[in-house]
Regions:
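N-terminal glycine-rich FAD/FM-binding segment characteristic of electron-transfer flavoproteins
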Residues: 1-357
């Protein structure tokens, strides 16, 4: 909210945002700003060109179009930081106070945040037993993994549940069942129409999926309702009155337990579509020079391909292959990671897999 007040003071034609902030990784700033500024919004933009009446954009789905000012644009691809030029170092930095932007002090800082982190703890939810094998045992390990299949991870249910939980779209239903007695599914609509449905329906909580459309729509609706939104939740619980949300934090090394201070609490939850491929090979930056060989092996064993964010940001592989906290979630019987460090942000997208090699 305070950021929008500062931007209004500057009266820009376009506001450019990254995919997500460096502190929260939630991807809410751009969509929320668009609502508070009453600007148009385009998300997941890969390229921009000047056009007669504004800008022409292409997004990660290879769709494109024109957008005119004023607008908020979130950029999908990260850019390498450049050393500041000598000229920029001598430029004055303008500091705006709360008074300068006419901000309500009671809504600044932690006091104004609609969500609260109640506690954090070490993330050990994805620990598995590990066996070291020699390279000649690879095909054996794949065959064993296929025989074993995967055990579907079912979220733990709370003993006491909220009376009415809404899902925007059907993908969050399994999560909703763990915390809600009565589940209502509504179809995604415009941000204004969706917000109005929620405002008049008075649900105890609203859940969203982790698809691109939901991640753009949910922050807009949260801003319209002046309520909190917790992103990329991996678990939910309730005591029958309050919804508690769990999500990875600090690069995924810890899990944060979060509560909404406003009503209704909203959350996007990590959901996975049923995988067509029983085997998926994930390609990381460490294997960037061997993509052709890996693709040939994948074709030989009838496997799909996935990628880490660094591989897609570096233009080695297309964005639709990205798996992880800021990508999609996959759940094959066998996931083969090649050149991947195993950062928790990537693991978040493969935790429903059967055997990981």
């Amino acid at each position: 909210m305070q950021l929008s007040l500062a931007i209004k003071r500057l009266c820009p034609d376009f506001v450019f945002c990254g995919r997500q902030s460096v502190d929260g990784d939630t991807g809410q700033v751009g969509p929320s700003l668009a609502v508070r500024l009453e600007f148009s919004l385009v998300t997941n933009v890969m390229s921009l060109e000047s056009a007669e009446n504004g800008l022409f954009y292409t997004d990660r789905s290879e769709n494109g179009g024109n957008i005119s000012a004023p607008a908020v644009i979130t950029l999908e691809k990260s850019r390498r930081l450049r050393l500041p030029s000598i000229r920029s170092k001598i430029k004055p930095v303008e500091t705006l106070s709360a008074n300068d932007i006419n901000a309500d002090i009671s809504l600044c800082g932690l006091k104004g945040s609609p969500t609260r982190v109640l506690k954090t703890f070490e993330n050990d939810s994805d620990r598995r037993s590990c066996t070291f094998i020699s390279p000649d045992k690879l095909m054996w390990a794949i065959e064993e993994g296929l025989k074993k299949g995967r055990q579907k991870i079912k979220p733990a249910e709370s003993a006491n549940k909220l009376k009415n939980v809404w899902c925007v779209g059907s993908s969050p239903i399994e999560f909703a069942k763990t915390v809600g007695e009565n589940i209502t599914v509504i179809d995604p609509d415009t941000s204004e129409k969706t917000a109005e449905k929620i405002r008049t329906g008075h649900p105890d909580a609203v859940l969203w999926g982790s698809d691109i459309k939901s991640k753009a729509l949910a922050p807009q609706v949260a801003a319209l309702l002046n309520t909190g939104l917790c992103a990329d939740c991996t678990a939910l619980e309730t005591d029958g009155e309050t919804l508690y949300m769990y999500r990875p934090a600090c690069s995924g090394n810890i899990i944060a337990k979060i509560r909404c201070e406003t009503k209704p609490p909203m959350a996007t939850v990590r959901t996975a579509e049923e995988e067509q491929n029983k085997i998926i090979i994930g390609i990381g930056y460490g294997a960037r020079e061997h993509i052709a060989a890996i693709k040939a092996f994948a074709e030989k064993i009838n496997a799909g391909i996935a990628a880490t964010r660094k591989m897609t940001d570096g233009d080695y592989l297309p964005y639709e292959l990205q798996v992880g906290l800021t990508g999609k979630t996959v759940n094959p019987d066998v996931y083969i990671a090649v050149g991947i460090s195993g950062a928790v942000h990537h693991i978040a997208g493969i935790r429903q897999s059967g055997t990981a090699i």
